[in-house]
Curated annotation (Swiss-Prot):
Source organism: Mus musculus (Mouse)
Phylogenetic classification of the source organism: Eukaryota, Metazoa, Chordata, Craniata, Vertebrata
Function per UniProt: Catalyzes the GTP-dependent ribosomal translocation step during translation elongation. During this step, the ribosome changes from the pre-translocational (PRE) to the post-translocational (POST) state as the newly formed A-site-bound peptidyl-tRNA and P-site-bound deacylated tRNA move to the P and E sites, respectively. Catalyzes the coordinated movement of the two tRNA molecules, the mRNA and conformational changes in the ribosome.
EC primary class: hydrolase
Matching InterPro entries: EFG_II (IPR041095), EFG_III/V (IPR035647), EFG_V-like (IPR000640), EFTu-like_2 (IPR004161), G_TR_CS (IPR031157), P-loop_NTPase (IPR027417), Ribosomal_Su5_D2-typ_SF (IPR020568), Ribsml_uS5_D2-typ_fold_subgr (IPR014721)
UniProt protein name: Elongation factor 2
Residue list for modification Phosphoserine: 325, 502, 595
Cited PROSITE patterns: G_TR_1, G_TR_2
Gene coding for it: Eef2
Modified residues (N6,N6,N6-trimethyllysine): 525
Length: 858
């Protein structure tokens, strides 16, 4: 079954220059899993006849049934490059065998957290684009994430069989399509990348360099310009050139590749390349890419699909393709598959592109270290990561948990960045909240076993050196979702992953049979472990809430909960959307609150953030961990804050990182530092449960204007200050025109021209609005982009399909928060209904609490 053993893999793991860690990323249904099959079959794990149909990496039953990838799966492949190909590799290498750790990731936007987890442990990405529908919204999202993590992309144009058989494009049109996709991808790379002067150098993709592949995953064939350049170099070589050395030959092939793309033309009359589109006698010349590459492919397709036997036989002989006896009797599509697969095998083309152009851990960790590691850039751990040193201290990042066949236990899945991880090694397990020098979120435990992940199987392995991807057994009890594993006692954490979506849709769950409650609680804990994104919360009313990224994500989570994690029947509520509370202008009075013993007074005001600041905090451009002066400068330059105020930010909230700020603009208050912690605690409490309906606050800046304190320390303890601070914060919100914010999806809808009207109808009913509409060049498809409130998105897909005759395909991504128009105090408005519903659901008193509860008189 497998052509190579664990021992062989283990031997090659030490050659860190010959390891490639890569993930396959793309828009939903552009053919990632199908393509991965051709790679897997090349490495001899599935029979080549079944490649393209097996979807080996879709390991779960529901993935096979729905034909979508839900969880990212990892697989290790072994590939050997020939002498000639080794000369194309520009980085250091060690022997001709390569170990490729491949992670197939989901394309569905609801699972984009899985993609983030996959990207963290890889250095390169194969971006798959369907050449018929082009670069879509999800392609852009995942590519942006990859570039933010400093991951080098190579491109694969998939589904060429559709372009040839369904759309029947001419060679020149097809070239233009490819050219446009390459341009689109490069625009994304240059927008989010660091430019040529950055640490990675130029990461733009270019067919001439061989970083773009073309082909069809379903039929199992693919090529880069390198394959054709080699054929033509061999064909045009004069008699005396047969003795070229490998290096000279590589040079010739690279020169040839430059002539095969772009505005270069070929004159068939004399076999010369020219740079002008017209020959000397005025004939229009064909483009080299069309004449020398697409033309032979078109001829093969044409001859076989029109059942011209003699012509087919001639072509097969000319292209020197050896068919099996059983393949010779086929005709039509099956024969086409067999011929193309023999002539341009996808596995070879892609694996060569991966080994030649994607970086090894040695290359990549040099420039990725500063993004990965939170600690100082010159301590032992950082040096170990930078040089990918097996003798350095162990540094390993766990990016997700993978459920095992044993109920309730998980493998910790991650990558070793420095040192060696081995069975029985005693390590420090550090969760995301660990800070060096403290004891919380830290465990000292031995690793029970190290294992190798092979898609549906796991293989035990003694030890794994740095640069590799590995699973650990026996760590799952100490980590929730992610964490750092190390042997270096002064190590800082590896940086937490930033998710591009946020969990905004929630359902309440309860056990159908109340006696099953303990099982439900246990199941929720396991669910929180197994999915990087999902949040499980217990409300004060005792309700169990699951929050996810969208309908599909929640559906899968609930199914997992019912069948795998809790194994009990479950009742679920309708999905509800979480809101945020904010203010729309500055407080109209200076708010005063007195402490319960009447000896301390706080004076505060609230005001809204300038546009864009809340988003900056979400992205981490502005954060609590930043250096103080740098942060003050940024706020002063970009948002015109007063520098003195910007330096006196006490904290961010909720949870110390959220998009609300508490600043101290008092002048000369005695004992202020003693109550700082208490005020901050009150602020965290108030921003987590706002005044309107106990939802999180967002985009509010609170200013402490003045504080009068009792001279005796005993009269100004936490019990006096914390509730006072909270009351004062609530008062300042209620006097500053409070508003509700709702989450908004960005919807991208692909559809034929004639049903665009139906889409507008559905969106208008759902309070959505279209902000961009464009035609995909060269196809009759339209792309409509619109904003749609998450609250209205339930059943949107079904509604859309029924109004467009099933021809429109929506993709929803959480995009931003937007203020719900209307005043929550006006009983007829939309926000006041939402507040009433939310308060009722949470079991709070009816109606927004009156201002008198919080505001005191002098």
């Amino acid at each position: 079954m497998v052509n190579f053993t664990v021992d062989q893999i283990r031997a090659i793991m030490d050659k860190k220059a010959n390891i490639r860690n890569m993930s396959v990323i793309a828009h939903v249904d552009h053919g990632k899993s199908t393509l991965t099959d051709s790679l897997v079959c090349k490495a001899g794990i599935i029979a080549s006849a079944r490649a393209g149909e097996t979807r080996f990496t879709d390991t779960r039953k529901d993935e096979q049934e729905r034909c979508i990838t839900i969880k990212s799966t990892a697989i290790s492949l072994f590939y050997e490059l020939s002498e000639n190909d080794l000369n194309f590799i520009k980085q250091s290498k060690d022997g001709s065998g390569f170990l490729i750790n491949l992670i197939d990731s989901p394309g569905h936007v609801d699972f984009s957290s899985e993609v983030t987890a996959a990207l963290r442990v890889t250095d390169g990405a194969l971006v798959v684009v369907d050449c018929v529908s082009g670069v879509c919204v999800q392609t852009e999202t995942v590519l942006r994430q990859a570039i933010a993590e400093r991951i080098k992309p190579v491109l694969m144009m998939n589904k060429m069989d559709r372009a040839l058989l369904e759309l029947q494009l001419e060679p020149e049109e097809l070239y233009q399509t490819f050219q446009r996709i390459v341009e689109n991808v490069n625009v994304i790379i240059s927008t989010y990348g660091e430019g040529e002067s950055g640490p990675m150098g130029n990461i733009m993709i270019d067919p001439v360099l061989g970083t773009v592949g073309f082909g069809s995953g379903l039929h199992g064939w693919a090529f880069t310009l390198k394959q054709f350049a080699e054929m033509y170099v061999a064909k045009f070589a004069a008699k005396g050139e047969g003795q070229l050395s490998a290096a000279e030959r590589a040079k010739k092939v690279e020169d040839m590749m430059k002539k095969l793309w772009g505005d270069r033309y070929f004159d068939p009359a004399n076999g010369k390349f020219s740079k002008s589109a017209n020959s000397p006698d005025g004939k229009k010349l064909p483009r080299t890419f069309c004449q020398l590459i697409l033309d032979p492919i078109f001829k093969v397709f044409d001859a076989i699909m029109n059942f011209r036997k003699e012509e087919t036989a001639k072509l097969i002989e000319k292209l020197d393709i050896k068919l099996d006896s059983e393949d010779k009797d086929k005709e039509g599509k099956p024969l086409l598959k067999a011929v193309m697969r023999r002539w341009l095998p996808a596995g070879d083309a892609l694996l060569q592109m991966i080994t030649i152009h994607l970086p090894s851990p040695v290359t990549a960790q040099k420039y990725r270290c500063e993004l990965l590691y939170e600690g100082p850039p010159d301590d032992e751990a950082a040096m170990g990561i930078k040089s990918c040193d097996p003798k350095g201290p162990l540094m390993m990042y766990i990016s997700k948990m993978v459920p095992t066949s044993d109920k309730g236990r998980f493998y910790a899945f991650g990558r070793v960045f420095s040192g060696v991880v081995s069975t029985g090694l005693k390590v420090r397990i550090m969760g995301p909240n660990y800070t060096p020098g403290k004891k919380e979120d830290l465990y000292l435990k031995p690793i029970q076993r190290t294992i190798l992940m092979m898609g549906r199987y796991v293989e035990p392995i003694e030890d794994v050196p740095c640069g590799n991807i590995v699973g650990l057994v026996g760590v799952d009890q100490f980590l929730v979702k992610t964490g750092t594993i190390t042997t270096f006692e002064h190590a800082h954490n590896m940086r937490v992953m930033k998710f591009s979506v946020s969990p905004v849709v929630r359902v309440a769950v309860e056990a159908k049979n109340p006696a099953d409650l303990p099982k439900l609680v246990e199941g929720l804990k396991r669910l929180a472990k197994s999915d990087p994104m999902v949040q499980c919360i217990i409300e004060e009313s005792g309700e169990h809430i699951i929050a996810g990224a969208g309908e599909l994500h929640l559906e899968i989570c609930l199914k997992d909960l019912e069948e795998d994690h809790a194994c009990i029947p479950i009742k679920k509520s309708d999905p509800v959307v979480s809101y945020r509370e904010t203010v729309s202008e500055e407080s109209n009075v200076l708010c005063l609150s007195k402490s319960p013993n009447k000896h301390n007074r706080l004076y505060m005001k609230a005001r809204p953030f300038p546009d864009g600041l809340a988003e900056d905090i979400d992205k981490g451009e502005v954060s609590a961990r930043q250096e103080l002066k740098a942060r003050a400068r940024y706020l002063a330059e970009k948002y015109e804050w007063d520098v003195a105020e910007a330096r006196k930010i006490w904290c961010f909230g909720p949870d110390g990182t959220g998009p609300n700020i508490l600043t101290d603009i008092t002048k000369g208050v005695q004992y202020l530092n003693e109550i700082k912690d208490s005020v901050v605690a009150g602020f965290q409490w108030a921003t987590k449960e706002g005044a309107l309906c106990e939802e999180n606050m967002r985009g509010v800046r609170f200013d402490v204007h003045d504080v009068t304190l009792h001279a005796d320390a005993i009269h100004r303890g936490g019990g006096q200050i914390i509730p006072t601070a909270r009351r004062c914060l609530y008062a300042s919100v209620l006097t500053a025109q409070p508003r509700l914010m709702e989450p908004i999806y960005l919807v991208e809808i692909q559809c034929p021209e004639q049903v665009v009207g139906g889409i507008y109808g559905v969106l208008n009913r759902k309070r959505g609005h279209v902000f961009e509409e464009s035609q995909v060049a060269g196809t009759p498809m339209f792309v409509v982009k619109a904003y749609l409130p998450v609250n209205e998105s339930f059943g949107f897909t079904a509604d859309l399909r029924s109004n467009t005759g099933g021809q429109a395909f929506p993709q929803c991504v959480f995009d931003h928060w937007q203020i719900l128009p209307g005043d929550p105090f006006d009983n007829s408005s939309r926000p006041s209904q939402v507040v009433a519903e939310t308060r009722k659901r949470k079991g709070l008193k009816e109606g927004i609490p009156a201002l008198d509860n919080f505001l005191d008189k002098l």
